[in-house]
């Protein structure tokens, strides 16, 4: 998840949000486990879970969930082989749609701070009862069960079995820093691409207008 700052900003305004997360994927699919899409109070959409029919169906599910509806765990089978199949990527994805409330603001502030410092942190979402997911954020590795730590070490998000409960584990993944020497048009395009895939971008240029964050 790289939406912690966006989520925190909206929660600070007292908003209720809908968050869609790919929690499991097998085979070929447009996005990986951990990809997310956020729907805000004014129905703005931040992030993507891959577009197409899947995203359209999930977006439709987000609207009632944001207003107070029951969380949903949606299953999409994209292994259709016929030419008229709507979804033929070849894979299968499970997507959790949950309501995010202002009471959860401390978790998201903490996660955003950890990400900015490249510090350890991991999201856990107990989805044993998909209608009532339990989301929490953890920063103390020594307090986590061995199966969770094993998943964290894989540097990827996934669902695991934890003492008979189904738990989604999403470690903070720090992509590193891209330093651009010069702020011209090539660096601008490179920086935008690097930011899009999760890197922190630093531009070094003695011309203030070229090193401006507004670019």
Features from the language model and the residues they span:
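Segments forming oxygen-rich coordination pockets for charged ligands
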Residues: 1-215
């Amino acid at each position: 998840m790289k939406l912690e700052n966006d989520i925190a900003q909206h929660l600070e305004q007292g908003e209720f949000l809908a968050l869609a997360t790919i929690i499991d994927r097998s085979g070929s699919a447009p996005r990986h486990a951990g990809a997310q899409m956020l729907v805000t109070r004014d129905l703005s959409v931040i992030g993507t879970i891959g577009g197409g029919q899947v995203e359209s169906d999930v977006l439709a599910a987000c609207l009632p969930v944001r207003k107070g509806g029951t969380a949903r765990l949606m299953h999409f089978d994209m292994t259709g082989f016929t030419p008229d199949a709507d979804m033929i990527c070849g894979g299968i994805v499970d997507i959790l749609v949950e309501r995010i409330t202002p009471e959860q603001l401390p978790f998201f502030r903490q996660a955003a701070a950890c990400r900015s410092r490249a510090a350890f942190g991991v999201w856990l979402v107990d989805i044993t009862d998909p209608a009532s997911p339990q989301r929490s954020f953890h920063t103390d590795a020594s307090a986590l069960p061995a199966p969770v730590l094993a998943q964290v070490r894989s540097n990827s998000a996934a669902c695991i079995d934890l003492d008979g409960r189904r738990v989604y584990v999403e470690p903070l993944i720090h992509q590193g820093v891209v330093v651009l020497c010069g702020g011209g048009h090539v660096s601008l395009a490179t920086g935008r691409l690097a930011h899009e895939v999760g890197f922190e971008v630093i531009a070094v240029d003695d011309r203030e207008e070229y090193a401006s964050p507004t670019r």
